[in-house]
């Protein structure tokens, strides 16, 4: 807490001392301090669609112009989001490739040598990671992948004749949870709430983010698959296809909910700071007591 207070105090002094009229591209502490002092803030932010960016006006990456631009449209052509998804799929394929035995054997010695180089040169990077963690991390991730593969065996073809909502897990830590969604910080709690309140006969299909494998405990997955109305999709399942097949998509503030919204599919989020909440088929869970009715709305299509 002392470090956080010092960071805020530093930026407050800087803004006052230099009489700043605009703050750009700073972290959350800088943005929050500028906002409290009435100083405009701008940050070039990825739009999570193609290679587009926009200027966010606060630490929640908001921009009021998005809704205005949407309302000004006179026609709505079909959205083409496969190209944007292809970039993510390429990244996930690289990460899967990095977990192969031969890739570990090739990269681990290089990582160890680089670590000692940083230590000898007394660089900060040399103290940021313990050697034991560096050595065990690739094997820990492989073990986590094997455990997940034993639990996540369902494919979209298994759900072809079933009604389900789709919940893709988000990587943690991640700005879309820790920074833009202060209302809900626990994906585990969100999943339990959704599974509890889903209408009878509706399944909750969950898919892990490839980038997050090895970051969660084994018990996280064990507790999820123990829920009777939950199925775990195989990590290689194409998320965009799951969005299209599901009756609705649910995240805290993830990109999959935005993709569902673009495609005109019902979507639920747990953050009030999403950029598409003004759409008629996008709803925000502001109170857990309203979740049952929102899920009935979403499941009805």
Predicted regions located by residue number:
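Active-site-proximal region of nucleotide-activated glycan assembly enzymes
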Residues: 37-141, 297-300
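C-terminal "capping" alpha-helix adjacent to the active site of nucleotide-linked donor transferases
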Residues: 283-301
């Amino acid at each position: 807490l002392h470090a956080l207070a010092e960071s805020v105090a530093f930026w407050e002094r800087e803004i006052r001392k230099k009489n700043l009229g605009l703050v750009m591209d700073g972290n959350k502490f800088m943005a929050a301090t500028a906002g409290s002092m009435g100083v405009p803030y701008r940050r070039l932010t990825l739009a999570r669609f193609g290679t587009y960016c926009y200027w966010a006006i606060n630490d929640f990456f908001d921009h009021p112009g998005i809704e205005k631009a949407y309302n000004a449209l006179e026609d709505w052509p079909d959205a083409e989001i496969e190209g944007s998804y292809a970039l993510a799929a390429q990244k996930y394929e690289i990460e899967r490739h990095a977990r192969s035995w031969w890739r570990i054997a090739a990269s681990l010695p290089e990582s160890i040598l680089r670590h000692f180089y940083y230590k000898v040169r007394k660089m900060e990077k040399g103290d940021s990671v313990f050697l034991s963690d560096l050595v065990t991390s690739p094997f820990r991730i492989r073990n986590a992948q094997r455990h997940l593969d034993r639990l996540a065996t369902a494919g979209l073809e298994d759900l072809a004749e079933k009604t389900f909502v789709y919940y893709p897990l988000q990587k943690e830590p991640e700005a879309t949870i820790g920074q833009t969604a202060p209302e809900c910080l626990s994906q585990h709690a969100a999943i339990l709430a959704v599974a509890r309140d889903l209408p009878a006969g509706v399944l909750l299909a969950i898919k892990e983010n490839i980038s997050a494998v090895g970051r969660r405990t084994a018990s996280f997955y064990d507790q999820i698959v123990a829920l009777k109305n939950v199925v775990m999709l195989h990590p290689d399942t194409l998320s965009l296809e799951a969005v299209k097949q599901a009756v609705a998509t649910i995240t805290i503030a993830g990109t999959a909910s935005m993709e569902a919204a673009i495609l005109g599919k019902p979507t639920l989020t747990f953050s009030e700071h999403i950029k598409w909440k003004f759409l008629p088929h996008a709803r925000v869970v502001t109170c857990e007591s309203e979740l049952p009715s929102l899920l009935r709305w979403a499941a009805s299509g």
